[in-house]
A protein has these predicted regions:
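Short amphipathic alpha-helix that is part of the acyltransferase structural core
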Residues: 1-48
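Conserved active-site tyrosine of GNAT-family acetyltransferases
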Residues: 16, 119, 124
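Short hydrophobic/aromatic beta-strand element in the GNAT-like acyltransferase core
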Residues: 26-27, 37-41, 51, 75, ...
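Conserved beta-strand in the GNAT
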Residues: 41, 47-59, 72-77
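Conserved acetyl-CoA binding element of GNAT-fold acetyltransferases
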Residues: 64-80
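Conserved acetyl-CoA pyrophosphate-binding loop and the N-cap/start of the following alpha-helix
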Residues: 82, 86-94
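Conserved GNAT acetyl-CoA-binding A-motif
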Residues: 99-111
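Conserved catalytic-core motifs of GNAT/GCN5-like acyltransferases
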Residues: 108-110, 125-142
Length: 145
């Protein structure tokens, strides 16, 4: 059984590195925004098998208060031997619910094109032209919450 738990940014780094950017130094997968994000791990027993990080932006409104309006998930990584077993679906469902609970009206990500069909299953659609991070093609995908 898969259990989703809040984790620290530091707990995400090894999996982010080994799955997403194994040819880069470990620091490549650390981002400045990590300290302000919400980080979740999918666990099988006590083994961390997938990670995702959620960042909620705030925008000033007429009252001067700052309210969440958009959420972005980043650094979504699943151990290869756990891919295509529903773990990513469980984790992304959790993040969609969390984004809604935090008041976001839009959830988006920079998606690797080889994962586009996965994101479409959640109702996400591409909203940008293809762009590259190194040799890897991406597009921005978005979901109205």
């Amino acid at each position: 059984m898969i259990d989703v738990r809040a984790i620290t940014p530091e707990q995400t780094y090894a999996l982010r590195h080994s799955v997403l950017w194994p040819d880069k130094p470990l620091n490549y997968v650390k981002i400045d925004e990590d300290k302000d994000g919400y980080h979740y791990g999918a666990f099988s027993d006590d083994d961390l098998v997938a990670v995702i990080s959620l960042f909620v932006s705030k925008e000033s409104i007429s009252t001067g208060q700052r309210q969440p309006v958009q959420a972005r998930f980043r650094k979504f990584a699943t151990q290869p031997d756990w891919q295509r077993k529903g773990v990513g679906t469980i984790l992304l469902d959790h993040v969609i619910a969390q984004a809604r609970a935090l008041g976001a009206s839009v959830l988006w990500c920079d998606a690797r094109l080889d994962a586009a069909d996965f994101y479409r299953r959640f109702g996400m659609e591409p909203v940008s032209e293809v762009f590259y991070k190194g040799p890897i093609p991406y597009a921005k995908f978005s979901l109205t919450l």
